[in-house]
């Protein structure tokens, strides 16, 4: 996961004005890092491009809104990276 984490942290730092050193696996992208929805869309686009996947952001948002998932499930860095790894693995399977 560290490679995925490093890439995602760099994408976040490059896309927003967040210092890469403040991004940890426990960081919540919205609550802790203060990433707004427009920046997050740019970040997701960059993640899609970097990893060759399509992050199902609408599905994740709907699951959170419907109470089927916590925001932590998708937006805490370590969980986001695990989801990205799963999407990459599913694509290559």
Curated annotation (Swiss-Prot):
Its main location: cytoplasm. GO terms for molecular function: acyl binding; acyl carrier activity. 4'-phosphopantetheine is transferred from CoA to a specific serine of apo-ACP by AcpS. This modification is essential for activity because fatty acids are bound in thioester linkage to the sulfhydryl of the prosthetic group. The modification O-(pantetheine 4'-phosphoryl)serine is found at residue 37. This is Acyl carrier protein AcpXL. Residues 2-88 form the Carrier domain. The keyword Phosphoprotein applies. The keyword DNA-binding does not apply. Carrier of the growing fatty acid chain in fatty acid biosynthesis. Is involved in the transfer of long hydroxylated fatty acids to lipid A. NCBIfam families: PRK06508.1. One of its GO terms (biological process) is lipid A biosynthetic process. It comes from the Bacteria. Disulfide bonds: none annotated. Keywords: Cytoplasm, Fatty acid biosynthesis, Fatty acid metabolism, Lipid A biosynthesis, Lipid biosynthesis, Lipid metabolism, Phosphopantetheine, Phosphoprotein. Gene3D superfamilies: ACP-like (1.10.1200.10). InterPro entries: ACP, ACP-like_sf, PP-bd_ACP, Ppantetheine_attach_site. Pathway: Glycolipid biosynthesis; KDO(2)-lipid A biosynthesis. It is found in: Cytoplasm. One of its GO terms (cellular component) is cytosol.
């Amino acid at each position: 996961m560290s490679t995925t984490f490093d890439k995602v942290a760099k994408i976040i730092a490059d896309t927003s004005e967040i210092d890469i050193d403040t991004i940890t696996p426990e960081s919540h992208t919205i609550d802790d890092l203060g990433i707004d929805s427009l920046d997050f869309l740019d970040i997701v686009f960059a993640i899609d491009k970097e990893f060759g996947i399509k992050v199902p952001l609408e599905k994740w948002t709907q699951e959170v809104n419907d109470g089927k998932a916590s925001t932590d499930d998708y937006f805490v860095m370590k969980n986001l990276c695990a989801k990205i790894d799963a999407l990459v693995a599913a694509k290559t399977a």
